[in-house]
């Protein structure tokens, strides 16, 4: 029987001796490698946090003591130690184990927001609540060095240090977020890793001077009074202690005994303490340790023996199309610069950074700063392109509104992972941008449907000098090209069904990458003898006025978007038609106003009613409600209507 099979709660970890802990750590690493290889997930961060997590659960009493995992992707070991090892076969699968902490899964999981730099603020609030309620409970916040580049962490540290509350901040310092951590903080932490143990020197001096009558104690006090000056020379940890935080470390994060000892000192101190643990991402798994890009930060299904992907798809991703095009644009325009927030490789800027290293700026996990810095770059005569996951632009809305749009700065935002992302769950879905950006004056939004329109609309956005622009696209592979068969104004027509006598017609407005879905919907609807036209507005803010006349020419308007219905493109089109006195009914299909659980993208799309068969059924029902019974149907009940006019192959062949 393996030692791991005997672990079902943190109490089981507390009874182990040091030799057993080393065995358990090795078994956990082997378990993680094989489990994540089958499902995909965040492998590297968790391999680097094994001993650290073991030590935390030995020193503190979860769930009475609260353990908060910033970002949360490094919580797999925590899940194992709290009785969820048997559930890893369903990791990140529909109805299975979440890839992040989940309050629905366990009482040991406190926060589940996977946006970085938030845990310290939660810790501040929790510790204040326990103090006011008279509860003697410790709060432990585990935060990576990458997350410490986020300003919210420093706002929290400033407040945590104001009172003597038992908050233990564990800095898991692996020198990376997705990529190597950058900036002044990274340099400071690097200095700490290399510095000698100042506290040991101070203890020896205190012991020697303490044995010296009369002169010794006053001399020690004098030396202790200039402690800050000594520390700044010997060990540059003053940045933390100047805030009023006790600092312990640096500690070898892969020595469970050393980490446990440091955590016990921190717990017994009774006030706010930072425990600085130096770890290695991907530790103990050679393929991860040798991966220079991101140490297997996130992997798909891999061969655990080699770390190589089990299958290599030849299909091109949206991100790679963007990556290729922005490099080409950069070669043509030396004024184009790019920014990202600790996501250089994930958002496709690796090639741009290699080609133009002086024109790419990774600002760390600091989206607010990235946006306003981009405004400054634009004011200075450059053309900044800010590249983020769509969900992370939520964090910088005020900067988009006031620092960019108010000043009419031509900043382009490229939002990767827009819409439903799937396996990463609620906080990674990019399903809000089309709604909250609708209220920003002067901002234009493009939603490309395929590779050619992504390339074209990116160029249009970068070439716009009138104000800010946004280009959004989803996670995953690009479907085959969907060429237009016609254009009306600036609107692309993708499909027209044959005119069928006495059948009312539908205008189906497809938003972005929903084009392939909408074409399948159109063919299903047309097979029922209903006339239908599919159009793609390309730019969804502001909407092209050509949509007004198109709507007038149809009896029902339907919008389909991979975004929330509330405040989305459907709502904007409804307002446009009302303002133009167009009295045509409109049905807007999108995502309901709720958070979505993890699962494959197609599974989640089906759950929210955006699968082609469900949309087609709803369109047919909407048409039926608005027309009388048909007397002379030219299509017999068992006979499908003729295929519609559209470019390319049948939709079944495209998928």
Swiss-Prot record:
Residues binding thiamine diphosphate: 73, 114-116, 146-147, 174, 285, 367
UniProt enzyme class: transferase
Reaction it catalyzes: D-glyceraldehyde 3-phosphate + pyruvate + H(+) = 1-deoxy-D-xylulose 5-phosphate + CO2
Note on how the cofactor is bound: Binds 1 Mg(2+) ion per subunit.
Known EC number: 2.2.1.7
Pathway: Metabolic intermediate biosynthesis; 1-deoxy-D-xylulose 5-phosphate biosynthesis; 1-deoxy-D-xylulose 5-phosphate from D-glyceraldehyde 3-phosphate and pyruvate: step 1/1
CDD domains reported for this sequence: TPP_DXS, TPP_PYR_DXS_TK_like
GO cellular component: cytosol
Cofactor list: Mg(2+); thiamine diphosphate
Segments for region (Disordered): 626-655
One record GO biological process: 1-deoxy-D-xylulose 5-phosphate biosynthetic process
Positions annotated to bind Mg(2+): 145, 174
Alphabetical UniProt keywords: Isoprene biosynthesis, Magnesium, Metal-binding, Thiamine biosynthesis, Thiamine pyrophosphate, Transferase
Top-level taxon of origin: Bacteria
Annotated Basic and acidic residues bias: 646-655
GO molecular function: 1-deoxy-D-xylulose-5-phosphate synthase activity; magnesium ion binding; thiamine pyrophosphate binding
Subunit and partners: Homodimer.
Family (UniProt): Belongs to the transketolase family. DXPS subfamily.
Reported function: Catalyzes the acyloin condensation reaction between C atoms 2 and 3 of pyruvate and glyceraldehyde 3-phosphate to yield 1-deoxy-D-xylulose-5-phosphate (DXP).
Stored PANTHER family: 1-D-DEOXYXYLULOSE 5-PHOSPHATE SYNTHASE-RELATED, 1-DEOXY-D-XYLULOSE-5-PHOSPHATE SYNTHASE, CHLOROPLASTIC
NCBIfam families (alphabetical): dxs, PRK05444.2-2
Protein name: 1-deoxy-D-xylulose-5-phosphate synthase
Organism listed in the record: Frankia casuarinae (strain DSM 45818 / CECT 9043 / HFP020203 / CcI3)
Name of the encoding gene: dxs
């Amino acid at each position: 029987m393996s030692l791991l099979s005997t672990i079902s709660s943190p109490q089981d970890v507390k009874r182990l001796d040091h030799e057993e802990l080393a065995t358990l750590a090795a078994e956990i690493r082997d378990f993680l490698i094989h489990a994540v290889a089958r499902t995909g997930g965040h492998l590297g961060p968790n391999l680097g946090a094994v001993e650290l997590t073991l030590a935390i659960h030995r020193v503190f009493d979860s769930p009475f003591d609260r353990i908060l995992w910033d970002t949360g992707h490094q919580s797999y070991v925590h899940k194992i130690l709290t009785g969820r090892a048997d559930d890893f076969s369903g990791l990140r699968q529909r109805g299975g184990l979440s890839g992040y902490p989940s309050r629905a899964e366990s009482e040991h999981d406190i926060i589940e927001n996977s946006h970085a730099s938030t845990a310290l603020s939660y810790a501040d609030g929790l510790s204040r609540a326990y103090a006011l309620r008279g509860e003697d409970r410790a709060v432990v916040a585990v935060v990576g060095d990458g997350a410490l580049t986020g300003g919210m962490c420093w706002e929290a540290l400033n407040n945590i240090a104001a009172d003597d509350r038992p908050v233990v901040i564990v800095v898991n310092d692996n020198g990376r977020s997705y990529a190597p951590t950058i900036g002044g903080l990274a340099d400071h932490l690097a200095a700490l890793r290399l510095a000698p143990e100042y506290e040991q020197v101070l203890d020896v001096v205190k012991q020697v001077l303490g044995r010296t009558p009369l002169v010794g104690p006053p001399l020690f006090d004098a030396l202790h009074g200039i402690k800050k000056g000594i520390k700044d020379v010997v060990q540059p940890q003053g940045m933390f202690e100047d805030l009023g935080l006790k600092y312990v470390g640096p500690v070898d994060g892969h020595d469970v005994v050393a980490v446990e000892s440091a955590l016990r000192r921190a717990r017994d101190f009774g006030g706010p303490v930072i425990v600085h643990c130096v770890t290695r991402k991907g530790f103990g798994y050679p393929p991860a340790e040798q991966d220079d890009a991101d140490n297997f930060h996130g992997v798909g299904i891999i061969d655990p023996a080699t770390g190589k992907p089990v299958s290599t798809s030849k299909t091109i991703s949206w991100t790679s199309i963007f990556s290729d095009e922005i490099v080409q644009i950069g070669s043509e325009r030396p004024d184009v610069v790019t920014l990202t927030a600790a996501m250089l490789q994930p958002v496709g800027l690796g090639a741009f950074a290699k080609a133009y290293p002086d024109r790419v700026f990774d600002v760390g996990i600091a989206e607010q700063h990235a946006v306003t810095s981009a405004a400054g770059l634009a004011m200075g005569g450059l053309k900044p392109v800010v590249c983020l996951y769509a969900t992370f632009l939520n964090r910088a809305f005020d900067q988009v509104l006031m620092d960019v749009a108010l000043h009419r700065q031509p900043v382009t935002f490229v939002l990767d992972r827009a819409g439903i992302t799937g396996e990463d769950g609620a906080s990674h879905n990019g399903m809000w941008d089309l709604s909250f950006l609708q209220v920003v004056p002067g901002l234009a939004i493009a939603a490309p449907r395929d590779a050619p329109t992504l390339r074209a609309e990116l160029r249009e956005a970068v070439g716009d000098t009138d104000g800010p622009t946004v280009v959004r696209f989803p996670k995953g592979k690009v479907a085959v090209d969907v060429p237009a068969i016609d254009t009306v104004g600036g609107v692309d027509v993708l499909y027209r069904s044959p005119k069928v006598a006495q059948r009312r017609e539908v205008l189906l407005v497809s938003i972005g990458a929903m084009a392939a879905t909408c074409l399948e919907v159109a063919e299903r609807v047309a097979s029922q003898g209903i006339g239908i036209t599919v159009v793609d507005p390309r730019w969804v803010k502001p909407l092209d006025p050509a949509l007004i006349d198109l709507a007038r020419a149809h009896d029902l308007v339907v919008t389909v978007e991979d975004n929330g219905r509330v405040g989305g493109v459907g709502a904007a089109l409804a307002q446009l038609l009302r303002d133009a006195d167009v009295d045509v009914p409109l049905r807007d299909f999108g995502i309901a106003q709720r958070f979505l659980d993890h699962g494959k993208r197609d599974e989640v799309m089906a759950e929210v009613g955006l699968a082609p068969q469900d949309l087609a059924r709803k369109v047919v029902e909407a048409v039926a409600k608005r027309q009388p019974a048909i007397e002379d149907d030219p299509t017999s009940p068992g006979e499908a209507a003729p295929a519609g006019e559209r470019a390319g192959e049948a939709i079944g062949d495209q998928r």
